[in-house]
Curated annotation (Swiss-Prot):
The keyword Iron does not apply. Keywords: Ribonucleoprotein, Ribosomal protein. HAMAP family: Ribosomal_bL12 (MF_00368). The keyword rRNA processing does not apply. It comes from Synechococcus sp. (strain JA-3-3Ab). This is Large ribosomal subunit protein bL12. Forms part of the ribosomal stalk which helps the ribosome interact with GTP-bound translation factors. Is thus essential for accurate translation. CDD domains: Ribosomal_L7_L12 (cd00387). One of its GO terms (biological process) is translation. GO terms for molecular function: mRNA binding; structural constituent of ribosome. GO terms for cellular component: cytosolic large ribosomal subunit.
Length: 137
């Protein structure tokens, strides 16, 4: 059975929104120098040990791989374009009015994460047409 402290942390994690969970994963990856990407092949248990034992060789192949998942980041929204951008954000994300408004006002913030390049470019185009400054990572 998990300790009381672990149970509290687990409950906090359950309460996170999808965007907050994504931010948490990125922060953990940066803080500990690890990757949350699923290991290839059937060596699920051996992969983390190998990565921990030899981090330099494991990091070398990564730049060679072509990026397949992209994040659309809402960088800035001019005050006079806020309503138009808000409508597009709601359409793209399915968020409610309050959540979409919070996202738009908290820029820079990710709108969509881990999506194909074509979809990311379409979303970027829609947001820019509405007046937002957008970046695809």
């Amino acid at each position: 059975m998990a300790s009381e402290r672990v149970q509290k942390i687990l409950e906090e994690l359950k309460a996170l929104s999808l965007l907050e969970a994504s931010e948490l994963v990125k922060a953990i990856e940066e803080a500990f120098g690890v990757s949350a990407a699923a290991p290839a092949g059937g060596m699920v248990m051996a992969a983390p040990v190998a990565a921990a034992a030899a981090p330099a060789p494991a990091a070398a192949p990564e730049p060679v791989e072509e990026q397949t998942a992209f994040d659309v980041i809402l960088e800035a929204v001019p005050a006079d374009k806020k309503i138009a951008v808000l409508k597009v954000v709601r359409e793209l994300t399915g968020l409610g009015l309050k959540d979409a408004k919070d996202l738009v006002e908290a820029a820079p913030k990710p709108v969509k994460e881990g999506i194909p390049k074509e979809e990311a470019n379409e979303i970027k185009k829609k947001l820019e047409e509405a007046g937002a400054t957008v970046k695809v990572k």
